[in-house]
């Protein structure tokens, strides 16, 4: 699998601006920012998390090119709902970490172990999208054809879902879509930045494992670091409060 990057750069940190731009630009226009050399014994991924002060609610994407070069359809994906982050594991190491927007409270994304059932480069929803009347005027930009059939002579235009990777029998999957860091926005699907969905689409095949979990997955390599940072932040806030008289 090839990525449009300098071959000498093995670990990449894609900035939030580049992630947003990628949703509007072609793959050839995507921008990458290299992670600087590691210090104090930290791994590339640990440094990515450490430097992202507001992680996990950030738009930055992490990619380890050396690990991604070894990724196969037997690699697995974890979607952590509480963090609103996704991770690709290769050889039990985090090869990529990215923001997601999963199902809103009214349409929660189901948890559990899944496998990719089907993938399609160009796909459109058969349930959600725009509804037009017989005159061709858009009368509903967020139509749900299961709840309200279109008018006579009208037509339905399903919402585009590029790089579609289906996971469940009732239509939940992963695809390119609007992502807002830390926000659950979808009708149940897992929305991905376009640069990420393109990368994953090239890796996954029928049967690739995808684990959707509410909490951080077992073996998450920076769990201890995250817990310690939360303690330190709580202590800092406590010290900043004015003492009671």
PLM feature spans:
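N-terminal pre-domains immediately preceding structured catalytic cores
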Residues: 2-190, 194-245
């Amino acid at each position: 699998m090839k990525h449009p990057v300098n071959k000498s750069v093995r670990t990449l940190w894609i900035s939030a601006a580049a992630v947003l731009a990628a949703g509007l630009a072609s793959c050839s226009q995507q921008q990458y920012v290299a992670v600087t050399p590691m210090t104090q014994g930290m791994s590339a991924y640990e440094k990515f998390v450490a430097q992202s002060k507001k992680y996990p609610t950030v738009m930055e994407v992490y990619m380890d090119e050396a690990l991604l070069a070894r990724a196969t359809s037997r690699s697995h994906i974890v979607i952590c709902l509480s963090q609103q982050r996704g991770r690709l594991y290769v050889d039990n190491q985090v090869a990529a970490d990215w923001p997601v927007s999963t199902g809103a409270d009214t349409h929660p994304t189901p948890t559990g172990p899944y496998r990719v059932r089907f993938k399609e480069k160009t796909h459109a929803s058969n349930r959600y999208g725009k509804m037009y009347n017989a005159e061709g005027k858009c009368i509903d930009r967020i139509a749900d054809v299961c709840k309200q059939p279109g008018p006579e002579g009208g037509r339905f235009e399903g919402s585009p879902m590029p790089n579609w990777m289906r996971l469940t029998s009732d239509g939940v999957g992963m695809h390119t879509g609007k992502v807002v860091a830390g926000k659950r926005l979808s009708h149940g699907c897992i929305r991905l930045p376009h640069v990420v969905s393109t990368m994953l689409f090239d890796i996954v095949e029928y049967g690739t494992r995808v684990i959707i979990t509410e909490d951080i997955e077992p073996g998450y390599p920076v769990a201890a670091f995250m817990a310690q940072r939360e303690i330190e932040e709580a202590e800092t806030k406590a010290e900043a409060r004015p003492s009671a008289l």
